[in-house]
Each structure stands twice: as C-alpha cells, then as structure tokens.
Amino acid sequence: MKTSAYNVYLGVVAAMLALLFVTINAAPMEADDETAENTLVAHPDGDMELSGPWDAINTAALRKLLLQLDAEDRMGGVTRSWPQAEPRGWGLRALDSRLARQWRADKRQVRFRQCYFNPISCFRK
C-alpha cells in the first residue's frame, strides 16, 4: 500500500517537473535586438549640456498640458453632472441678436434627473 502511494507521488512530482521544463523552454525569450533597444543609454557629455534647457522647457510644457487636461476633465464632469444655465454674455448670440437655444437633450436630461430623484413631481395630472 505504501509503495503504490509512493509511486503515485513520484509520478505526480515527475509530471510537474516535466511540465515546468516544457513551459520554461517554450516561453518566448527576448532577442538580443530587443534587449539592446530596451536598455537605457547614457548621454554623452556634449549632449547633456545642450539638452538641459530643453528638458526644463519640455517639463514646463508637459506640466501646463496636464493642468489643462485636468481642468477640462473637471469642467466636463461638472457639465455632465448637472446642466448649466445659459450664459449671459454675447458668446452664444445668433446673428439676429437672439440667444441661441440649448439642445433639447438638455431639457430631457433635466426632466430625467428630476423624475429620478423626485418621482412624485413627475406624475402628470
């Protein structure tokens, strides 16, 4: 009885080792070209002096871009969460000095939100 359990245990261990070796050999390895492309290359001394001011300019431009994108995301979230009132300036006026009307979808969205949060107010008499 002990020998058969021992043989089964050895068979399972041998099968696991064989599976491990097969997966190691079958796994794709990076070629030398790919490893050469992925390694970090140090700048020569001459390039470092020239790229110093450009790095600062690039960093400032990226920071400005990220701030603008973040502000646009926040403003987009505000306008999506609740429709804003019509602006009172001259920006949305048509040629004949009438205010340009907002989309009908905004009214539907307001009605949907009112009905969702206060369903009693949406019953028609």
UniProtKB/Swiss-Prot annotation:
Q: Which residues carry this modification: Pyrrolidone carboxylic acid?
A: 109
* Signal peptide from the UniProt entry: 1-26
Give the GO molecular function terms.
Answer: neuropeptide hormone activity
Which residues form the propeptide in this entry? 27-106
Recorded GO CC terms: extracellular region
GO biological process terms, alphabetically, are: negative regulation of juvenile hormone biosynthetic process; neuropeptide signaling pathway
Query: Which cellular compartments is it found in?
Result: Secreted
Q: Which UniProt keywords apply?
A: Cleavage on pair of basic residues, Neuropeptide, Pyrrolidone carboxylic acid, Secreted, Signal
Q: Which domain of life is it from?
A: Eukaryota
What family does this chain come from, according to its entry? Belongs to the allatostatin family.
Functional summary from the UniProt entry = Strongly inhibits juvenile hormone biosynthesis in vitro by the corpora allata from fifth-stadium larvae and adult females.
Q: What is this protein called?
A: Allatostatin
Q: Which organism is it from?
A: Spodoptera frugiperda (Fall armyworm)
